[in-house]
Amino acid sequence: MITRHNPTQLHNPPGYHHVTVVEAGRLAFLAGQCPLDAFGALVGAGDIDLQIDQVAANAAAVLAAVGARPDQVVRSVVYVVSDDNSVLAAAWRRLTLSVIGSAFTTASTLLGVTRLGFSGQLVEVDLTAAL
């Protein structure tokens, strides 16, 4: 069972929760999902929207491979190569509207970073799901 809470002593966050509680059970820890195609090639060089779409598709495939749905995600960390708040906000919005959008209603962190692992990579998503 998964429950999500916002303590009354804290601000009410837009679209996600401060804490997610999972009753004892199985967890799936996804490796960081990158904007790579099935052959390992970068998708959407220089285009963050195309990269987000690929990351979302990859994450959906990995979740499905272990019998999980996006609404079973209990923790997300999103990395975006930018220090511009408008770019970070746009990336967050696109993810929340993607095929894995419900994964981002849980305990989440959005980080602007200077670089990711692959040359030209602009976004990466790290998810944990309760099965």
Model-inferred region functions:
Residues M1-A57, A61-V66, D71-V74, V80-L131:
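N-terminal presequence-like segments and the immediate start of the first folded domain
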